[in-house]
């Protein structure tokens, strides 16, 4: 059976923890150097020496990033293979219906060539991410400010550097794209993992559909679905009808963070995965009104609030780790994290959803 969207999301978070480790390593090394600079007298500040230390640290961070990128790619390729095999198994009965012998998975050349093309694309994407991760300039700006603050003696070192380090903790390690747009490394990794699996699944489904002569599609269905796709999920359409429908949607199926995919079917042969009553239950569940404090929202919207809370808790932990390693007070930050955790738990209980503290995990901190 195909891996569910929720399982894929969970796996993507797990793999992307490798890049969370890189982020933590970067923040810790930078914070420790800022702590050491703060112990120096202005007459003992040697900019070149500090730049050399910074350079060694950046080299170490980049080496660690390269290592974690390689390990992540191994995990991703294993996921691709597992997902592709499950997708291939699921359509064996459609080959049989057409009287076509389904080739062994490894002997289906078209499928293997497609998977290899996605593997190469993914490898290039992650290697480019590693090369374009913005570490050096961010680190240099922080060290420059630390040296200047000590050298001039005008401003309070702890206050100035505390603000700078908090900003760097929230920003984290960033990937810079050719367009100039930046994104946090961990977020970029998760996005690319999920997109890669989506490409694998859709490619296998499309190619097998061609091989056994599919004449329709079924749109996947899942609970807690966005309102704009609720009327269509779980439904079967002819190929032409689906193409017309999808081109009419402002947010087409399978794009813009949509977790839906389509299975290529033979109309009248492929059974519906969900009957109308089951789809209605999913719709009712997603649209159920939830009262959070003095505001009302749908259960689906509550899941979005939870995802944002998980992100905010990760950033807050990054602040605490950074301040702790810089030898600065972080009690207020820890208190705020406790309040964030309570609010997250409150939202989950109001919406009757399971808290996912694993999605707020940051290496080096016990939430």
Give a label for each model feature.
Residues 167, 175-176, 183-280:
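Acidic, glycine-rich two-metal-ion catalytic cores of nucleic acid-processing enzymes
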């Amino acid at each position: 059976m195909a891996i569910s969207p929720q399982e894929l999301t969970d796996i993507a978070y797990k793999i992307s923890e490798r890049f969370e480790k890189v982020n933590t390593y970067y923040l810790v090394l930078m914070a420790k150097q800022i702590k050491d600079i703060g112990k120096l007298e202005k007459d003992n500040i040697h900019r070149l020496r500090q730049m050399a230390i910074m350079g060694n640290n950046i080299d170490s961070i980049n080496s660690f990033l390269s290592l974690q990128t390689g390990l992540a790619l191994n995990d991703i390729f294993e996921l691709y293979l597992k997902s592709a095999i499950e997708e291939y198994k699921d359509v064996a009965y459609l080959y049989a219906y057409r009287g076509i012998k389904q080739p062994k998975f490894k002997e289906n050349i078209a499928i293997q060539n497609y998977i290899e093309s996605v593997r190469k694309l993914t490898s290039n994407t992650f290697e480019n991410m590693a090369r374009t991760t913005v570490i050096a300039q961010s680190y240099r700006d922080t060290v420059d400010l630390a040296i200047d603050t000590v050298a001039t003696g005008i401003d309070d070192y702890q206050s100035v550097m505390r603000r700078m380090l908090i900003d760097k903790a929230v920003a984290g390690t960033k990937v810079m794209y050719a367009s100039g747009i930046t994104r946090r490394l961990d977020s970029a990794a998760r996005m690319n993992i999920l997109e890669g699996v989506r490409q694998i699944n859709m490619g296998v489904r499309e190619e097998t559909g061609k091989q056994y002569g599919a004449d329709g599609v079924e749109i996947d269905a899942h609970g807690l679905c966005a309102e704009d796709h609720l009327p269509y999920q779980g439904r079967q359409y002819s190929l032409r009808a689906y193409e017309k429908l999808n081109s009419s949607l402002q947010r087409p199926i399978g794009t813009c963070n949509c977790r839906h995919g389509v299975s290529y079917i033979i109309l009248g042969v492929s059974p519906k995965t969900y009957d109308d009553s089951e789809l209605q239950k999913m719709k009712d569940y997603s649209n159920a009104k939830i009262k959070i404090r003095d505001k009302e929202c749908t259960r689906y919207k509550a899941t979005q609030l939870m995802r944002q809370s998980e992100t905010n808790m990760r950033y807050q932990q990054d602040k605490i780790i950074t301040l702790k390693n810089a030898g600065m007070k972080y009690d207020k930050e820890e208190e705020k994290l406790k309040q964030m955790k309570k609010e997250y738990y409150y939202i989950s209980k109001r919406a009757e959803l399971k808290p996912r503290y694993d999605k707020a995990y940051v290496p080096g901190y016990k939430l």
